[in-house]
Design a protein with these regions (language model features):
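Sec-dependent, cleavable N-terminal signal peptides
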Residues: 19-23
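N-terminal Sec-pathway targeting helices
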Residues: 2-18
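Non-catalytic tandem-repeat scaffold regions and their flanking low-complexity/translocation tails
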Residues: 12, 25-378
Length: 378
């Protein structure tokens, strides 16, 4: 089974992936554009990459760039290149994950960035699975764990992608059970993030340029596979985390229809909330970091309750990907009944995502509302 990854390492995703993961998503890195523009040396291979549609040739050029300027600058160069956020670009960026694994082994994972929907992580983890199965994955996750929850949760998500690609798309349940094996093998391994990665991979499941016929998707059933009785209840929450992305495809980007025809009709409250959470994260990359756009798109939710929830999720998503301005602007403009949830989410993220040089007090100063600023400082 592992040999399948070696054969398909460069062809397993060729469709656009639009979720928010967490993720889609780094508006905070837009400031790096100037640095890229100044670095004309990066333009050499990037220009050639953009001039061809042949993936094999693009991989050769990208590898050359990685070797010349280093993995970090190469990833920035590709991100700022203007290449579309399509499956082919996602797949191309797997190259840096392959490179890092081959050169540094499991320790190389920490040099991955989450650009192009964490494709460096995906390429790296797939390579680890092909190289040594669960043992190598565990070694890589050990390095992730040292970096804290914000990093190791993302690694677990990438591992979930790899488990399904390795098992084969018809073996969705097997991949989910492999996540359970990982929980028993690796300390602090977050099961939900792995399940989430499995279900996200099931949505895209692309081989040779078209969705695999083996993926668990029914175009006439927007609740499938979350309503499939073969899937254990403990996995269903992660299924609903991704279902809005699938429905968004089915309804050709009609956010209001996804909200009213899919999420609003989910009967169990826990699953319904996760559906709206997934839809809010689907909205996040569409906002382009603009608080006004967030408020506009979230107004498409079917009630004020879900409107506020959508706004709060987007504020948190913006903070998680590095934006230190928009989240505070978003919470300042949410309706009064939504402020507690919005600011509460941001304040908890400030602690969870605190970086060495960040000063909480200076971040609190960005809260424009005095009462909430005091709560932030306390």
């Amino acid at each position: 089974m592992l040999s399948k990854i070696k054969k398909h390492l460069y062809i397993w995703v060729v469709g656009i992936i639009t979720i928010s993961l967490f993720l889609a998503f780094k508006f905070g890195i837009l400031s790096l554009g100037t640095r890229f523009q100044r670095d004309n040396s990066v333009n050499i291979e990037i220009t050639e990459i953009k001039a061809t549609q042949n993936l094999d040739e693009q991989v050769k050029l990208y590898t050359k760039l990685i070797e010349r300027v280093g993995p970090e600058q190469a990833q920035i160069g590709l991100l700022e290149s203007g290449l579309p956020f399509t499956g082919q670009t996602h797949l191309l960026n797997h190259t840096v994950g392959d490179y890092l694994y081959q050169k540094y082994g499991p320790a190389g994972l920490l040099q991955c960035q989450d650009y192009f929907l964490s494709s460096c992580y995906h390429g790296f983890i797939l390579h680890a699975i092909a190289d040594g199965g669960m043992q190598k994955v565990a070694e890589a996750f050990g390095y992730c764990r040292k970096e804290g929850p914000a990093v190791f949760s993302q690694c677990a998500h990438a591992i979930g992608h790899g488990f399904l690609a390795n098992a084969g798309y018809k073996n969705l349940i097997q991949a989910l059970q492999t996540c359970d094996q990982a929980v028993n093998t690796m300390s602090e391994f977050p099961a939900f993030n792995c399940y989430d990665g499995v279900f996200m991979e099931n949505i895209w499941a692309v081989h040779d340029g078209k969705p695999s016929p083996d993926r668990w998707v029914k175009t006439n059933d927007t609740q499938y596979p979350c309503n499939d009785k073969r899937i254990d209840d403990k996995y269903i929450l992660a299924c609903w985390s991704n279902q809005p992305s699938l429905a968004y495809q089915f309804f050709q980007g009609d956010i209001k229809k996804v909200a009213s025809s899919v999420c609003a009709k989910v009967k169990k409250l826990e699953y319904q909330q996760m559906c709206f959470d997934g839809l809010a994260r689907q909205i996040h990359p569409l906002t382009q970091g603009q608080s006004s756009k967030t408020l506009e798109l979230c107004s498409l939710m079917p009630s004020q309750q879900w409107n506020n929830f959508c706004v709060s999720v987007n504020a948190g998503a913006s903070y998680a990907v590095g934006d230190r301005d928009a989240p505070f602007q978003i919470c300042a403009n949410i309706s009064p009944e939504g402020k507690n949830e919005c600011y509460g989410r941001i304040f908890s993220y400030m602690k969870a995502y605190q970086k060495g040089a960040e000063d909480i007090k200076s971040l609190c100063a960005k809260v424009s509302e005095l009462d909430w600023r005091k709560k932030c400082e306390n």
